[in-house]
Amino acid sequence: MADVRDVMVEGESGLIACSARYGLEAHYIVSKRRVEFQNGARAYLYSADEPNRLRGPQHEKAWCDELSTWRYADDAWANLDMGLRLGDNPQVVGTMTPRITKLVRDLVKRAGEGHDVVLTRGKTSDNKANLPDAFIRSIESRYAGTRLGRQELDGELLEDIEGALWSLSQIDDCRLAALQDAVSLQR
């Protein structure tokens, strides 16, 4: 929950700071794990480290930050997904540095198939107006042109590792969905 509080609620680009920029008051109520806005809206706070807390509550909107680093991504996402049942058009915004995980791969696939996912990509340079020039110069000089730079600076979803014998798509093509007619071997 510390990341949720420190980044998404109280951070420089968190809910409280962004609300203030638009003339709205937002109050973080620690004991209730929520942010209340002056217009009556409420944002309930959850951590993917506690996926069962998402079991049961229902929501209209969700913001999932650093989705590709969630330890219990499948459980947290499934519980959140089942609770998105309020309003006419429940929606999720996922923000992250792209990393290959099963969940991210599934979301990218759904976006490519024209399902209910819209994929938006951005680069660090798109956010230059909000970052110190010294920071931009420093990270670009160190990471531009590297694999880490492609991921962190360019927002690329890197599936394959240079020099690997097989690509992830080749491995995925050979995966078994489930063992059928498994036989128990006894001695």
Annotate the PLM regions:
Residues 128-187:
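ATPase catalytic-site recognition across NTP-hydrolyzing enzymes
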Residues 34-38, 108-115, 174-180:
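Short, conserved catalytic or adaptor-binding loops enriched in Gly and charged residues
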Residues 69-145:
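ASCE P-loop NTPase helicase motor core
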Residues 58-63, 89-91:
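Short, surface-exposed connector motifs at secondary-structure boundaries
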Residues 3-60, 157:
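Inter-Walker segment of RecA-like/P-loop motor cores
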Residues 47-51, 79-80, 173-178:
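A generic local structural motif
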Residues 65-67:
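Walker B catalytic acidic pair
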